[in-house]
Amino acid sequence: IFISVITYVTGLALEGAQWPNWIYYTAFPIIVLYAISQFKKQNLNILSLSQALKVGVLIGVISAIVIMIYSMIFNYLIDPEFMSQMMEVARDKMLENPNMTEEMVDQSMKFIEMFSNPAISGAFMIAMSAVFGLIYSLIGGLIMKREE
């Protein structure tokens, strides 16, 4: 949410800057691994792989739900025009590409429009966060597991 606010305030969001997303891509696995280590510490230094997986997936799903709620508040209350502005910027950038035909641009815009639907993007976000939470917790669980 912090990254989203910063990119919105600075105008980076409409420019399509991707580097702020790398902050999230770095922070998410760190948070998952930290949560697993804290769970292990609270559990007398015992951790099974299934416990690690539960923690990781739960962190992923909760983070996606929080981001989804923020996105809905942002897109419906704070700046209802933002998504249409983003779509316009995306269309303009695609039209600047000499290799893209009008048909390709229209097809891409249909795809972007589909994912601008809060229900579809929210479901996708929850699923992807759960999958990445599972992957990171599998790695962390294999490293940190210690059973009785």
PLM regions: where:
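Membrane-interface interhelical loops and short interface/amphipathic helices
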Residues: 78-115
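Transmembrane alpha-helical insertion/packing segments
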Residues: 1-38
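Membrane-helix interface/capping segments
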Residues: 37-51
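Hydrophobic alpha-helical membrane-insertion segments
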Residues: 59-81
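Short helix-capping/hinge motifs at transmembrane helix termini and TM-loop junctions
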Residues: 11-12, 71, 75-79, 144-148
